[in-house]
């Protein structure tokens, strides 16, 4: 099994994975990245109207996978103005 590192991005904040996780294959890497991204989204959304979350995976040397989630709330009906 190979060791992969899952770095997490929340807009401009970066949390680097310096421990890594051993994975059997690329399917396992994709599954862990997706679960990590879903967990991050559950923790931080909806705290902003727009947010970019990502999990970038590398093997210590080379990039392997990028997973992105972009959340944007688009207000279609503005709040009424008060005088």
Q: What do the PLM-derived regions correspond to, one by one?
A:
Residues 14-17, 63-65:
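Surface-exposed loop/edge segments in extracytoplasmic proteins
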Residues 1-16:
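Short aromatic-glycine-(Arg/Gly/Cys) micro-motifs in beta-strand/loop hairpins
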Residues 1, 24-28, 59-63:
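A short, structured loop/turn motif at beta-sheet edges
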Residues 46-83:
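C-terminal structural segments of small proteins and small subunits
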Residues 16-24:
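A short, exposed loop/beta-hairpin motif centered on an aromatic-Gly-Thr core
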Residues 30-43:
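Charged, amphipathic alpha-helical segments
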Residues 1, 40-49:
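Short linear motifs in intrinsically disordered
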């Amino acid at each position: 099994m190979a060791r992969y590192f899952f770095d997490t991005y929340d807009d401009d904040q970066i949390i680097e994975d310096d421990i890594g996780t051993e994975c059997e294959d690329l399917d396992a890497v994709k599954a862990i990245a997706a679960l990590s991204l879903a967990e991050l989204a559950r923790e931080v959304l909806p705290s902003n109207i727009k947010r970019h979350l990502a999990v970038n995976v590398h093997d210590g040397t080379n990039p392997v996978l990028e997973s992105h989630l972009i959340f944007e709330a688009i207000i279609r009906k503005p709040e009424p103005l008060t005088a």
